[in-house]
Amino acid sequence: MHLTPVLWDELPAFQNTPLLKRLFHGGLPQALLSATKTPSFYREWMDSFFARDIQRLFAFRDPDKFNALFEFVMKQSGGLLEITRTASALGISRPTVENHLRALETTHAVTLLRPFHGGGQKEIIKTPKVYAFDTGFVSFCRGWDPLRPDDYGVLWEHLVLEFLRAHGHEWKIQYWRDASGREIDFVIPRNRAEVDIIECKWDPKKLDPAAMKVFRSYYPKGKNYLISPLSIPGYSKRVAGLEIYVSNPDGWGQRLESSRSGKK
């Protein structure tokens, strides 16, 4: 199975649903089209997911352990996921956590992004970042009701990742982070020499280019993107000596199609 919520470019087909509603309710059509967010929908969906899909496909016997991990991952979504700490926090064995995570990944209920590394100093090389499949479940599990402006950024990051995975399915999407905490949201190796990087910002004016600059000191070749919910065409600008293309997800998708067809 593959859980595919309504994507950024599909919102006009869903009664021109406002973006903030998409972030809050999530992208499952029943939730997205509902006039109000109903907590019971998300709880019942998570409970039935085990019986409907997980137990049938993987023969797990303990729904409580699985659902505890699933909810824990939802709360961690958008952050680093350390397996040993997760097992300790939940009182579950490490092998059980690993098996359940594989099931969640196989069913596309979560995405684990592995760190990009190779040429930099003191890079994170093992710990993955975890993203739940849908922003509605993230906001539900975190108790974000209503959303605050501080919540928009991490949910927007999820929506961008969903778009990247749907439209750039041939690329391996990773993230980058160093020991100082500098981080690039998404890293896409294009070939052995070129690496594209993507930062997601709800407000493009709040971009701090420090991490991009450090990354490019190690990996100089590749395109730099800043993806924000813009209603205007994409544009290029220079920031801290870097050429950065600023656009909404559609703008990134158009550039991707141009590169596929050999255009510049």
Features from the language model and the residues they span:
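Interdomain hinge/linker elements that couple catalytic modules in large macromolecular machines
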Residues: 2-179
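A cross-kingdom feature that marks ATP-driven nucleic-acid transaction machinery
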Residues: 102-103, 109, 114-264
